[in-house]
Amino acid sequence: MARVKSGKVTRRRHKKILKLAKGYWGAKSKLFRVANQAVMKSLMYAYIGRKLRKRDFRRLWITRINAAARAYGISYSRFINGLKKAGIEINRKMLSEMAIHDEKAFAELVNIAKQQLNA
């Protein structure tokens, strides 16, 4: 049976990892084994970070909506409850943008929510 040499394959794999490790400090950008560990860890952190970003933005939107709703004399939870009862399905991102950029429309939504809660 013929001997299989994997020099080209290994070199390509090493180059790929070292390219991903570019900019890392010290051995993490030079030595394959250390760079491989650093790259694997960084990819793991990136994956987790993409999940956390969604949570963070949702929290930010809710905080903004709450602040804007309280300016009109209603809490966030009562505001959302009123909108649900009114059958208005606007997501929190859009509500947050409306609270910042379109105060008249947001005030209308607050009035609708208050009417539904009083009814």
Swiss-Prot record:
**Gene Ontology MF annotations:** rRNA binding; structural constituent of ribosome
CDD domains referenced in this protein's UniProt entry, alphabetically: Ribosomal_L20
Name the source's superkingdom: Bacteria
Q: Which UniProt keywords apply?
A: Ribonucleoprotein, Ribosomal protein, RNA-binding, rRNA-binding
GO CC terms in record: ribonucleoprotein complex; ribosome
Q: What are the recorded Gene Ontology BP terms?
A: ribosomal large subunit assembly; translation
Family membership noted in the UniProt record: Belongs to the bacterial ribosomal protein bL20 family.
Say what the protein does: Binds directly to 23S ribosomal RNA and is necessary for the in vitro assembly process of the 50S ribosomal subunit. It is not involved in the protein synthesizing functions of that subunit.
Name of the molecule in the record:
Large ribosomal subunit protein bL20
Q: Which organism is it from?
A: Caldanaerobacter subterraneus subsp. tengcongensis (strain DSM 15242 / JCM 11007 / NBRC 100824 / MB4)
Q: Which gene encodes it?
A: rplT
